[in-house]
């Protein structure tokens, strides 16, 4: 027998003792706060949790890269330890889930919309899979004492985290409480919220940690067991097919039940493995030689070597070749599964479904007979292996049981964006958790862009009293929703009675520095636009800067209280200057200060402090549009800086954002805003159907590439090609944004791309407020 395996069997050998209590079934002897458990004589185990990655929707090339990287991870496993890779299917606790996603009532006149939204969320939650998959790696090793074990796990943990990072997954260590919670949730399904464990208090009171996780009863029968009122069964993979698809593990875990699938891996040192295979090959060659000698003695000189002997020789040579030239390692492994159900009939039906799934892949599962307790302790991530149905595999063969499928997006206090097409689970994302929360919503006309944006706005207004929403609306699409949500619609045009003072400014405008310096930059840009887009000379810039400081002097001295100056005051300040250039500037801007286009030269007469503001710029003429865009963006910056001082978040939605990129100054201002707002607690969203046009602007291309959150709905063919290049989208992923219905597409969250579908019930008030379909508005 191979030395490594012999040593391992020796270490795992334990005296069998009939369990006297429920607690004694659990094979943990001692726990430490950092998550290391003693699970045998000098055998220590530690568990790491790793996140799923988008394997199922990746391109063939990406899948190959992930497969090879996962093979590297398996190759890097230490020979002296046993590694257990576990997939834990657990059902979300309904009550806990509802508390997390449902919007509490606020008695502010909007509760009827909250009730509607909650009904929609509950419908989606009921139709969803409601199964969450957690994935763990448990390393168990024999060491003399806890200090040696701790040093070992620190080194191994760093390696594991590095390998998972390269796969695009995040790996974290679990402490004692986190590990105990896994077992508690399995043993006590339905009581997930009741788990509470404090190591210090438990030690002080002399309680046993097993009391916090064990079920009320354990009953082990010939081919199943009972945990409390539930039934369970452990099965193991007995027969392996010659060829197994990489989707087998994912298909086995698709069953909508509480279950755990574990693969125990025992790597063998390459020198031992080569020696073992060479000995086997030598044995095969000896058998062939003996057979040939016997045939020769019988004068049968042309006899062909029997097929089975030839196969043994061929397979042994291939195995040896794998070990010596293809960087494969010999691994011993056993695959076990435990699944639970409410009734025995349901359990039998689930077992048959799992056996059928395995048969589809030409593999054969078998139920463990009279070994259910050992099987249960093997399948759960304790770090023990009590089932000896080991199979010899190479790294490549073992990597087929790849534990990755699809990434789930479920953030705390997030916004509902639809359902994951693959797992059918709800997508709840919180842009605050990303490196920058800026976003784009892209899609052809009719794909559901406005609806998606309105749904997000509605969610923010109804759920977060500490957040404000500002909309730039060039198509007058958002007014009904804004009015229904008690917001303010500001109509901006040359003839409108609504006015925004271009010179408005608060004390927080300067980001800690003198606000006038930053405002002076804005006035310079504004004057360049007012003069006709011509570049200002050095003299003109100096005059404008001097006049800006002069016109704000009294407002600054009054600590930014009272009435701010207007563009009319600014022009009067220009006229006071002696330089002829000042008179020229004053004359050039007269149309916009005292003439017919003076809407931005008057004091602000609208409520810019409402929680929900919509700037309606549909009637902004060609002459006023560049200036109007600048003034609106500056007004938004004013609000963002005010909110920052109050500790409030600001969400900005800009529909038809490509309009802003048609004017150099508004494009540059927007680019600066995009980069700066993250530190102000603000999040910008650009909405457009013209992706190709948008990407003609280098500024827009940079903004799109740097946005961490992108909602891609149905795309035109040219736009798809551009997006695929920019965001590295595979052909398979592209199919989710090709000729799909409204509200379907791809969601980019950080580095993840998740296919989603979002259907909102039509028989609701909210739907009527959000739809832009002709005949439904």
Language-model region placement:
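Extended, folded cores of ATP/NTP-driven motor/assembly subunits in large transport
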Residues: 1-404
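P-loop NTPase motor domains
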Residues: 53, 60-79, 90, 253, ...
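Hydrophobic anchor at the beta1->P-loop junction of P-loop NTPases
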Residues: 441
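P-loop (Walker A) phosphate-binding loop of NTP-binding proteins
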Residues: 444
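Conserved lysine of the Walker
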Residues: 449
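Hydrophobic positions on the alpha1 helix immediately C-terminal to the Walker A/P-loop
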Residues: 452
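Post-Walker A helix-loop "phosphate-sensing" segment adjacent to the P-loop in P-loop NTPases
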Residues: 459-470
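A short helix-turn-beta junction within AAA+ P-loop NTPase domains corresponding to the substrate/partner-engaging
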Residues: 486-490, 699-712
């Amino acid at each position: 027998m191979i030395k490594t395996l012999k040593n391992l069997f020796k270490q795992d050998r334990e005296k069998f003792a009939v369990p006297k209590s429920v607690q004694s079934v659990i094979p943990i002897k001692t726990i430490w706060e950092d998550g290391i458990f003693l699970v045998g004589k000098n055998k220590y185990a530690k568990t790491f949790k790793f996140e799923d990655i988008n394997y199922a929707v990746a391109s063939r090339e990406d899948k190959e890269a992930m497969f090879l990287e996962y093979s590297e991870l398996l190759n890097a496993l230490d020979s002296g330890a046993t590694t257990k890779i576990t997939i834990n299917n657990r059902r979300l606790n309904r009550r806990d889930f509802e508390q997390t996603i449902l919007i509490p009532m606020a008695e502010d006149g909007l509760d009827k919309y909250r009730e509607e939204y909650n009904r929609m969320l509950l419908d989606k939650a009921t139709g969803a899979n409601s199964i969450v998959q957690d994935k763990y790696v448990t390393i168990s090793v024999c060491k003399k004492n806890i200090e040696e074990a701790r040093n070992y796990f620190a080194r191994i943990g760093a390696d594991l985290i590095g390998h998972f990072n390269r796969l695009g997954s995040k790996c974290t260590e679990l402490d004692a409480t986190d590990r105990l919670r896994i077992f508690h949730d399995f043993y006590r399904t339905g009581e997930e919220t009741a788990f509470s464990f404090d190591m210090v208090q438990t030690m002080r009171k002399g309680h046993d940690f097993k009391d916090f996780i064990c079920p009320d009863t354990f009953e082990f029968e010939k081919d199943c067991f009972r945990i409390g009122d539930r039934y369970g069964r452990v099965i193991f993979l007995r027969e392996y097919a010659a060829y197994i698809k990489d989707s087998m593990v994912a298909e086995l875990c698709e069953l909508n039940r509480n279950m755990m699938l574990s693969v125990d891996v025992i790597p063998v040192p390459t020198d031992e493995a080569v020696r073992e295979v060479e000995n086997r090959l030598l044995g095969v060659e000896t058998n062939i030689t003996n057979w040939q000698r016997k045939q020769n003695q019988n004068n049968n000189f042309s006899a062909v070597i029997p097929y089975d002997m030839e196969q043994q020789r061929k397979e042994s040579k291939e195995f040896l070749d794998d070990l010596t030239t293809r960087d494969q390692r010999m691994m011993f492994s056993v695959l076990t599964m435990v699944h639970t159900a409410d009734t025995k009939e349901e359990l039998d039906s689930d077992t048959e479904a799992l056996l059928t799934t395995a048969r589809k892949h030409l593999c054969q599962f078998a139920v463990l007979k009279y070994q259910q307790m050992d099987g249960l302790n093997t399948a759960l991530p304790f770090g023990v292996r009590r089932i000896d149905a080991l199979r010899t595999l190479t790294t490549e063969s073992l990597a087929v049981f790849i534990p990755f499928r699809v990434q789930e997006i479920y953030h705390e206090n997030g916004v509902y964006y639809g359902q994951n097409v693959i797992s059918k689970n709800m997508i709840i994302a919180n842009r605050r958790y990303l490196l920058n929360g800026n976003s784009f919503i892209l899609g052809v006309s009719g794909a559901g862009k406005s609806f998606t944006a309105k749904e997000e706005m509605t969610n923010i207004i109804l759920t977060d009293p500490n957040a404000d929403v500002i909309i730039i609306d060039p198509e007058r699409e958002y007014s009904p929703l804004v009015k229904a949500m008690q917001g303010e619609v500001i109509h901006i045009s040359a003839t409108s009675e609504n006015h925004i003072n271009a010179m408005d400014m608060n004390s927080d405008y300067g980001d800690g520095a003198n606000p006038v310096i930053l405002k002076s930059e804005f006035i310079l840009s504004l004057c360049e636009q007012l003069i006709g887009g011509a570049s200002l000379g050095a003299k003109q810039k100096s005059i404008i800067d001097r006049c800006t400081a002069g016109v704000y002097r009294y407002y600054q001295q009054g600590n930014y209280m009272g009435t701010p100056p207007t563009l009319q005051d600014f022009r009067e300040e220009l006229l006071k200057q002696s330089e002829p250039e000042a008179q020229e500037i004053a004359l050039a801007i007269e149309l916009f200060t005292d003439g017919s286009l003076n809407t931005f030269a008057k004091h602000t007469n609208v409520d810019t402090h409402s929680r929900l503001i919509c700037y309606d710029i549909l009637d902004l003429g060609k002459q006023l549009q560049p200036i109007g865009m600048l003034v609106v963006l500056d007004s938004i910056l004013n609000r963002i800086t005010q909110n920052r001082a109050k500790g409030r978040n600001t969400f900005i939605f800009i529909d038809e954002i490509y309009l802003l990129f048609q004017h150099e100054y508004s494009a540059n201002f927007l680019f600066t805003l995009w980069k700066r707002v993250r530190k102000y607690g603000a999040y910008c969203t650009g909405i457009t159907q013209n992706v190709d046009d948008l990407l003609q602007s280098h500024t827009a291309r940079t903004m799109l590439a740097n946005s961490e959150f992108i909602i891609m709905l149905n795309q035109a063919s040219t736009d798809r090609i551009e997006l695929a290049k920019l965001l590295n989208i595979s052909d398979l992923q592209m199919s989710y944004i090709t000729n799909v219905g409204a509200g379907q597409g791809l969601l980019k969250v950080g580095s993840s791309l998740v296919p989603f579908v979002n259907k909102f019930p039509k028989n609701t008030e909210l739907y009527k407020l959000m739809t832009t379909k002709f005949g439904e508005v």
